[in-house]
């Protein structure tokens, strides 16, 4: 059990946790160009006897050393969400065996723990150090790229995503993220090229459909955008997708369909102010002006900027 726990630790923080809020997302308002950076989620192996990182030498694990004793302590601290102590134990582990080939992974783990604590610059430095040690490690590049997005260093993120597709041309997450960054920059041609490349490598890709949905919405093709959103929603519904499809329905005067999506989204996340803003827009289109004003206030109460709320409904 202890060995399994240590090995789990070695892989755990290489993954960008779903609880790091999309931090790794580029976001704009629902009535503007909506974009988001996909997070890569991979299964954590439950048991293994050897450990290797992409671009690193495979090594056997001896769990009897002080190096792994520190890791076990670090994992206990992580389980308790005691990030500062976990950080200390990882540093002690690295210091105990400076030449251990697993250190690039520990440094990446350290970066992710720092990210949890909001130490973004320190996290970037440590991701960079880990990547210098294993330059072709796609997961590390992806982690640093998503952190660059969180730190509003979009050009650096783009550079990392491009490195990923140079190593692995069929990596759909990286291509999706590149496409979404181009979309944020209003470079629609390059965005479309990335989404088409995803389709070429992965004909049934949901990410390709999602990217094309946002692209069509950004370029005013709301009917086609709604169709793409529908394909993704069938397989993997989310509030973001429902809200964006609802907005497309509003733009094409399909008010009943928009109402269904808005109500479904509000049932899932009733604290999302933008959903009330969408509903206010719907009610205004139905000439329910008093109800629309109530929803505008609800949107503001749930964190929407008052100026944005009023501007969106002009």
Where are these regions (language model features)?
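Register position in tetratricopeptide repeats
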Residues: 79-80, 116, 150-151, 184-185, ...
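TPR alpha-solenoid repeat register
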Residues: 103-106, 140, 174, 208, ...
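Structural marker of alpha-solenoid helical repeat scaffolds
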Residues: 96-99, 133, 167, 201, ...
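Terminal, low-structured helical/coil segments at or just beyond the last alpha-helical repeat
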Residues: 29-30, 46, 51-61, 277-314
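Residue-level recognition of tetratricopeptide repeat
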Residues: 66, 100-103, 137, 171, ...
